[in-house]
A protein has these predicted regions:
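Conserved FAD-binding catalytic core of PHBH/FMO-like flavoproteins
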Residues: 2-154
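Conserved mid-domain beta->alpha element of the FAD-binding
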Residues: 45-46, 102, 134-135, 155-225
Length: 225
């Protein structure tokens, strides 16, 4: 994606900026960052995920809702994956209230592993280290291949999966939301990523059709989605 963006002179990627809030007038909108820098534009699209800062200026709701689903994530060099499972496909190993998903990354050099189980033990957590012992306990009694694969990982990152209640409005003037910032959902079947891509196509369509009426374009986009 970064390489694709770099092919266009009108796309500028700015790193190490945290957006705190937004402002808008009749003719423009702006984001204000933690370091007090600001950026102006005709339109602002908040595609900043479940914990969206942009959303706070549009939707007056509470913190994300803890789902009771916990995901442990890790990667494994392909040469450590058993031959029978070195497939260039998504493979799902399903068990009672648990499942393991594996698929290749980086041109097939590594295997991504996502182990999911149900637990109400955690209230929040994102990109923190999980305990291998807990994963072993949750997956106890499952297929030997699954247990062997899990045992090969020494360090797991843990995510407490969350979502939100649906809302009818996620646009305000020249500011709108996209993807999980607008309508977060659990990660199953990559549905959140798919919805974000659909959002982007729909948004581009309406902005192209109503380039002189940004507010109308954002409302049409929201109504379609």
């Amino acid at each position: 994606l970064k390489r694709a963006c770099e092919q266009f002179s009108n796309i500028k990627i700015i790193f190490n900026k945290r957006v705190l809030t937004t402002r808008q007038t009749e003719t423009s909108a702006s984001v204000i960052c933690e370091d007090q820098s600001s950026y102006n534009a005709e339109v602002i699209i908040g595609a900043d995920g479940l914990w969206s800062e942009i959303r706070k200026n549009i939707v007056n709701d509470e913190a994300p809702r803890v789902s009771g689903h916990i995901a442990y994530r890790a990667v494994l060099p392909l040469n450590e994956v058993p031959d029978k499972a070195r497939e260039n496909e998504v493979i799902l190993w399903a068990g009672p209230r648990t499942h393991l998903v594996q698929y290749p990354l980086h041109r097939g050099e590594i295997m991504n592993l996502v182990a999911v189980f149900h637990s109400h033990r955690y209230e929040e957590g994102w990109d923190v280290y999980g305990e291998s012992s807990e994963l072993k306990e949750r997956f106890s009694g499952q297929h030997a291949y699954v247990l062997d694969l899990l045992a090969k990982i020494n360090s797991w990152k843990m995510w407490v999966l969350c979502d939100r209640e649906p809302v009818k409005n996620w646009s305000n003037g020249r500011i709108s939301l996209l993807g999980d910032a607008a309508h977060p959902m659990l990660q199953y079947l990559a549905q959140g990523g798919c919805m974000a891509i659909e959002d982007a196509v729909c948004l581009a369509y309406h902005l192209d059709r109503q380039s002189e009426n940004i507010i109308g374009a954002l409302q049409a986009y929201q109504n379609n989605r």
